[in-house]
Amino acid sequence: MFQTLRFLSRCLVTGDDKSMYYFIMNPTASSGVGRKVWKQLKPILKTRGVKYKLIAQTDKEELIAIVKKLTGRNKKLSFGGTIEVVDAASEEEIKDKDVHLVVLGGDGTLNLVFNSIVDLEHTKLSCIRIGSGNDFARNVGIEKDPEKALIKLLDNPEEIVLDYGEADYVMVDGMRKSRKYVISSGIGYDADICQEASHSKIKKVLNVFHLGKLVYVTIGIKQIFSRSNTRAKIYLDGKGPLCVRNLFFAVGMVHEMEGGGVPFCPDADPEDGKLDVCLAKGAPIPKLLTEVAMVYCRKHLLFSNVSMYRCRSIRIVVDNPQWIHTDGETPCKVRQVIMSCRQGLRLVK
């Protein structure tokens, strides 16, 4: 089925006069940049007579509930937090149509929305860049300028069916959970950076000046000096184990870049049905510092302690619990994780 979808998605998507767009935004995210961007986009929608609903929601649980109801084919709901409704189509007009969600935000908001989608087959997903990360938008070639991105979406949309990942993990207390991701999931060094950055007070200040990346660079250098590696057993597509005495980090990626444009997996193809895995073992600090710098030049694979694999799934079992991230979000520490590639993310850009 997905092969057929991929073929059809290469055709241009043409809208009709009954198309409905559900714009989703956290108005307080990225130091309030979202509100400013919306003020730029709203006149474009009004001028073109576009039917839309803006769901501006600061409460994560409320947003999750709204997305679940929308994508569960149940559009008769109360839009808590909605601040704009323009020329909304009737229930009869849209009940048999796909739901089109447009996320105004960064990778964190996109991850939250994607994990809340009930029916992927009948949900189209678009995004407009807001925030300091935006790795998903960068990976799939979405315009950096929000106004240009919206105009492209309205005038010349293209649908692509992409892969996504799913991380099934065992927490320290033995409980099992899972989360989907659109970019990457990793444990070790990159997850430690995400965890520390999520609690960084200075990040909020730097985001105001569009300098959020500096936080990740600073924390990245700090973590090289401070983190403790762990023993690990790794299984690729059920085969193994590959025993690693000092795991620095392992990341399973759908796309090339994570962490604000870091190309850990430069050959990743988001339409091949497989994850690209970058695995790094511990090394002397000077070597690690050099490797991290060389990642930006895509030269990190020249080092003997860095390996690349391609697989449908990877299972990682660690001796010491490690932080895990999915698209930069760090829910907990884990004892083991299975990262798997899935298909069926309908991106419209």
Which positions does each model-derived feature cover?
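Phosphate- and divalent-cation-binding pockets in alpha/beta enzyme and binding domains
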Residues: A65, L112-V113, D135-F136, D192, ...
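ATP/NTP phosphate-donor binding region
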Residues: M1-L101, N111, N115, K148-I151, ...
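Catalytic core of DAGKc-family lipid kinases
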Residues: R48, Q57, D119-F248
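Glycine-rich beta-strand-to-loop/alpha-helix junction loops that act as flexible
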Residues: P27, L104-G106, I128-I130
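ATP/nucleoside-binding phosphotransfer catalytic cores, i.e., glycine-rich phosphate-binding loops
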Residues: G34, L236-G238, P263-K349
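Short amphipathic alpha-helical segments
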Residues: R35-V37, F114-I117, R138-V140, P263-F264
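Glycine-rich phosphate/pyrophosphate-binding beta-alpha loops
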Residues: D190, F249-C265
